[in-house]
From Swiss-Prot:
GTP binds at R49, I50, H51, S52, E53, Q70, E92, G93, R94, T114, T149, K154. Binds 1 zinc ion per subunit. CDD domains: GTP_cyclohydro2 (cd00641). SUPFAM superfamilies: RibA-like (SSF142695). It catalyses: GTP + 4 H2O = 2,5-diamino-6-hydroxy-4-(5-phosphoribosylamino)-pyrimidine + formate + 2 phosphate + 3 H(+). This is GTP cyclohydrolase-2. One of its GO terms (cellular component) is cytosol. The gene is ribA. Pathway: Cofactor biosynthesis; riboflavin biosynthesis; 5-amino-6-(D-ribitylamino)uracil from GTP: step 1/4. It comes from Blochmanniella floridana. It comes from the Bacteria.
């Protein structure tokens, strides 16, 4: 197990009252959190969102991406479902870090797409490690989920980590004129699915 559960507390939100649980990676001491809602002890697959940290989208309301509205929509879907989990995966900027993300934005301002910008800075298109999220689910005693995502790579990695994904639930929100190139690039180069149906 790559991390351990270290703290928890009640977290009232606009959408409902969650439990916030903090986790710390054993080797790096990086922190991640999970928000859980409702009774998760049943046998039905749990609606789950893995949301990668995005300070600019989540907290500063940037329209360069769809992250902020994905976060709020996922929390709403979970409360409407009556149970669920949101893992806040703290690997900013597809895990290149906040300052490099700002550098990548500057390159995008000069014509690069989101993948090219990362590569120009010496990174892979996506540096994230989703096995951490699988370990969080295991620490929560969750084996079977319905995953809120447009990214099939998350499903593949979770399945390899022995988390059963029974359904991909699309989360297609937040497209606007300022992020349309970004979303098109994610579909073309990163394989994200912006269809209502799982493929």
């Amino acid at each position: 197990m790559q991390l351990k559960r270290v703290a928890e507390a009640k977290l009232p939100t606009f959408w409902g009252d969650f439990l916030i649980i903090g986790f710390k990676e054993n080797q790096t001491e990086h922190n991640h959190i999970a928000l859980t809602y409702g009774d998760l002890t049943g046998s039905n697959p749990v609606l789950t969102r893995i949301h990668s940290e995005c300070l600019t989208g989540d907290a500063l309301f940037s329209s360069r991406c769809d992250c902020g509205i994905q976060l709020s929509t996922a929390l709403r879907y979970i409360t409407e479902e009556g149970q669920g989990i949101l893992i806040y995966h703290r690997q900013e900027g597809r895990n290149i870090g906040l300052l490099n993300k700002i550098r990548a934005y500057s390159l995008q301002d000069h014509g690069a797409d989101t993948v090219e910008a990362n590569q120009c800075l010496g990174f892979n298109a996506d540096e994230r490690d989703f096995t951490v999220c699988a370990d969080i689910l295991k620490l929560l005693n969750i084996q079977t989920i319905r995953l809120l995502t447009n990214n099939p790579q998350k499903i593949e990695i979770l399945n390899k980590s022995h988390i059963i994904v029974t359904e991909r639930v699309p989360l297609i929100v937040g497209r606007n004129p300022k992020n349309s190139k970004y979303l098109d690039t994610k579909a073309l180069k990163l394989g994200h699915l912006f269809s209502s149906y799982y493929k």
